[in-house]
Amino acid sequence: MLQIWVKLCLLALLFGAGNVSAQQTVTEAKIFLQSSRLAGFRYYEGRKLWPRMQLKDNLNLVREADNTYDTNAVRVEWQGHKLGYVPRAENAALARFMDRGQHPEARITALSKEKRRGRWIEFDVYLSH
């Protein structure tokens, strides 16, 4: 959470403290929240979709507040297909943002296949401001 606060302060200094002239406008700034490895990939639709997924593809994050296993659950989807979840150890702050009406964006940053561990997806999460 401190990392996010520091980034917000830096953005305020850059964009709100006179560094932008009256003629310039800032339309959108993206604030990096976290990088995560998808949890539960092998249990959902990821295996059959793997050949179609590409780096930089958008992912949809869906809050599951009523999830019986994790009250902070955030489901990860690709083109309407469930791939898995944001890992439990990394989802609390993201869930709070979503509960406050924020709509974080996510993009695939790595599609890897390791011999011992199988296929996995890594993704970054941002908030647009």
Region roles according to the model:
Residues 2-11, 16-129:
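Conserved active-site motif detector
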